[in-house]
Amino acid sequence: MNVLISNDDGYLAEGIAILARVASEFANVRVVAPERDRSGVSNSVTLDRPLQLKQAQNGFYYVNGTPTDCIHVGQFALPDFKPDVVFSGINRGANMGDDTLYSGTVAAATEAYLMGMPAVAFSLNDASGRYWATAEKALWTLLAHFFKKPPSAPVLWNVNIPAVAPEDVRGIKITRLGRRHHEQNIVPSRNPRGEQIYWIGPVGEVSDREEGTDFGECGAGFITVTPLQIDLTAYPDMAETAAFWHTD
């Protein structure tokens, strides 16, 4: 089985090295990742310049584009390689709740799903670098189970690994997305020339970490797996919307 791996932290990130190393024990792996950190770019594609595919000394390929670009390049530009499955990650930091809408890690998996492939995004609920051993041990468990009977149809799964010691992981839970308050305040500043500039502020506090949510269960020490879908249609609102826009 051929597995394409990407991320949004860049091809030099620790997480993608771990994911590639473990996945290589189960499948034929190729890595195509951004040449630099592209966190938070969501599903954006590069349309204002051509893309270049280069190979690093460790064998990984990297692209001067976004995670979504990397999936397109990995699908159509790699010599003698057609992916059957796509893994994205391991992201340095969680991708849960509303944050999945901004995540380049989740976006890479989403693009693969749209192309008709099973896709899994992996993230570690920690940005300090202290729990990579937990992530690696969790991956061995997750991928051993995945490859026993790989999905035969496209799926889109978002996996988050807790920030606990390896021996303290409590198991796996299937969850729904939680929510957070969006309090991304603008932080004003000045550049060295004295010109006004702005930074996007920190994310808001989590507002829904109830039992059964990714925020709640991952925070309690569980590996969370959340099945995602692409269809954004608000089906319960169809009738109300039709009534509002009725013009006869």
Curated annotation (Swiss-Prot):
The keyword Acetylation does not apply. One of its GO terms (molecular function) is nucleotide binding. Its EC number is 3.1.3.5. It catalyses: a ribonucleoside 5'-phosphate + H2O = a ribonucleoside + phosphate. A divalent metal cation binds at residues 8-9, 39, 91. It holds the Pfam family SurE. It comes from the Bacteria. Keywords: Cytoplasm, Hydrolase, Metal-binding, Nucleotide-binding. Its main location: cytoplasm. InterPro entries: SurE, SurE-like_Pase/nucleotidase, SurE-like_sf. Its cofactor is a divalent metal cation. Binds 1 divalent metal cation per subunit. It is found in: Cytoplasm. Nucleotidase that shows phosphatase activity on nucleoside 5'-monophosphates. NCBIfam families: PRK00346.1-3 (NF001489), PRK00346.1-4 (NF001490), surE (TIGR00087). Belongs to the SurE nucleotidase family. PANTHER family: 5'-NUCLEOTIDASE SURE (PTHR30457), 5'_3'-NUCLEOTIDASE SURE (PTHR30457:SF12). This is 5'-nucleotidase SurE. It comes from Neisseria gonorrhoeae (strain ATCC 700825 / FA 1090).
